[in-house]
Structure formats: C-alpha cells, structure tokens
Regions:
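Active-site loop segments of alpha/beta catalytic cores
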Residues: 15-171
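The substrate-binding groove and active-site-proximal loops of carbohydrate-active enzymes
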Residues: 3-16, 74
Length: 171
C-alpha cells in the first residue's frame, strides 16, 4: 500500500460538492425543530473497509496488516484521521450542529489493539475537529466497545456512547 500516493481531502467543496447544498437544506428544514447531526466513520473502521474491500465479519486482512506491517497501518490510519477530520469540519461548516464518530468495527479488536490502532487515530481526528470547532459537541461510539469503556473516558470526545452490552444500572 502506497499511503503517500493517497489523495488528501484538500477542498471538500470540490471533492464532495453536493454536501454543502444537502446539509444546508437539511439545516433550514430542521432549524428550531431538531439538531442536525453530521457523522464520520472512524479511522480504524474506514481502514478496515478499505483493506477488506467490503464489510467483513472477521477482518483477517486488516488484522494481518496491523501485525505484519504496523508501520504501513499506522501511516494509513494517520492519513485517514487527518482527512476524515477535514471532512467532518466541512460538515460542521455546512451546518451540522453535532458530530458523531462511528467506530463500527471496534468489536473486531481486543483492548490492546483498540489502544494501539483505533483510539489514538479516532482521538486525533476528534482533536483536529475540536481545534477548528471547539464548541461543536462530538459523540464517539465504539460498537462492541463496552468491554473497554474505561479506556475511552480520556478521549477528546464530549460524549461516549455505550452499546447494548452495558448494564446501565452500574453506570
């Protein structure tokens, strides 16, 4: 994988020109009635989709890359974090009032791999977004991440979602 050859998101108005119109229209439609959420996939989740080429229930190729070529995986995750932050910033500037970061494939990771390959890159993306829009609430959701909920509490997100595995009376 040639990470340096990947195209950065320099100008979202050019790469996703429809987004400003759609989010702007939705914002006008929902104004005073509902909060408009923007959303992004997290770097690990997007990397898994990219490496696997589709949704995959095991993510074997992604895990193989994580452990056999960690330098490439880290460079790829860093690239995604920076670019997905730019995309999220664009959504906010187009009218999104809250942003949710979905770590849809967290359940494929053990706690240690979550700490190495998912958390730092999701947190980097969130920090980059917060630099530009510190007052925009950001929600982080790690599907299956309840097993390592404690590891998420120091993230830059304003809110951490819990999944169905959490016993709410223990919270």
């Amino acid at each position: 994988m040639q990470v340096k050859a990947l195209t950065p998101v320099d100008d979202p108005d050019k790469s996703v020109p429809f987004l400003r119109e759609i989010i702007g229209s939705l914002r006008k439609e929902t104004e005073g009635k509902a909060t408009l959420l923007g959303f992004i996939g997290s770097p690990f989740t997007l990397a898994a989709y990219s490496v696997e080429g589709k949704a995959n229930k095991n993510c074997f190729n992604t895990k193989k890359m994580m452990h056999n070529d960690p330098a490439i995986m880290h460079a790829f995750l860093d690239h995604i974090a920076e670019n997905i932050a730019a995309y999220a910033i664009h959504q906010i500037e187009c009218g999104a009032q809250v942003l949710q970061v979905f770590e849809s494939w967290a359940h494929h990771l053990g706690p240690d791999d979550f700490d190495v390959f998912a958390k730092p890159y999701a947190d980097k993306a969130i920090a980059l977004i917060k630099e530009k829009h510190p007052d925009t609430p950001i929600i982080y959701f790690a599907n299956g991440g309840s097993a390592y909920l404690e590891r998420q509490k120091d993230m830059n997100a304003d809110m951490i979602c819990v999944d169905w595995q959490v016993l709410m009376h223990l919270m």
